[in-house]
Amino acid sequence: MIRRRGNVEIRVYYESVRPSRSRSHLKPSDHQEFPGHHVSPGSPGFPESPGNREFHDLPENPGSRAYPGTRDPHDPHGCPGSLDPHGNPAQPAGLPSPVPYAPLGSPDPSSPRQRTYVLPRVGIHNAPASDTRAPKRANSRHRADRPPESPGSELYPLNAQALAHLQMLPADHRAFFRTVIEVSRLCALNTHDPPPPLAGARVGQEAQLVHTQWLRANRESSPLWPWRTAAMNFIAAAAPCVQTHRHMHDLLMACAFWCCLAHASTCSYAGLYSAHCQHLFRAFGCGPPVLTTSRGQGGWCN
């Protein structure tokens, strides 16, 4: 029978047991089958038996020769364990007579006490606790501010939040920066196919236009001259040769870097450019502006 209490399982076993029977009905030879049985005084295993050689080798001790079944003639009252002349146990003087015990008889199979009865055994086991945890569910919904991951998820980090970044740029840089964001979002939606063939050329043309306007307004008077010159040289060389999304990604990041140089001390994308535009940081000695050099030098088209 099994009972449960919380996480504990109690099992009750029933075992058939017969009461022990008296050995008085067994033969003398049957006593040898039970270890620890008592031997009679006349048996070879008894210490006083004539067949026990170890007993005869012991030294005589007159004070230790009072054995059960004998009586000291000098002791009128007897000693415990001695027998009287009639063969009954002797009782020392001053002690009450022992209560006689009824002899053990042979077991009666018809007696209710001798019948087989059942003893229960109880075993406590730890029942296996059921798993109450809710099954794991795949989260198929993505956060609203994070697009689903794709093989090209490490590309095109410029997202919709960059539109708010527009308000921190000078007015003559905002149109070009908006074009960079739109092309970046368009390419990020379809990274399994090659980027649009005309997108790179369009970005390159607008970059040269805005850079020419900036040169006219800030010729040799801006501390950003080396870095913007390095960025525009890279853009002019890369725009005609865009073939993969990695090429498009590098081109767009260089364009965004060119725009954000206008507020380099407060730009929130500084960490982003540190990861993707390190090749533009060492701009000292980059050479003359791109408008005075031949197109295509130093790019992927060589």
Swiss-Prot record:
GO terms for molecular function: zinc ion binding. InterPro entries: EHV_Unk. It is found in: Virion tegument; Host nucleus matrix. Keywords: Host nucleus, Late protein, Metal-binding, Virion, Virion tegument, Zinc, Zinc-finger. Residues 135-144 have a biased composition (Basic residues). Induction: Expressed late in the infection cycle. A zinc finger (unnamed) spans 255-267. Transmembrane segments: none annotated. Residues 40-50 have a biased composition (Low complexity). Residues 1-155 are annotated as: Disordered. Phosphorylated. This is Virion protein US10. The gene is US10.
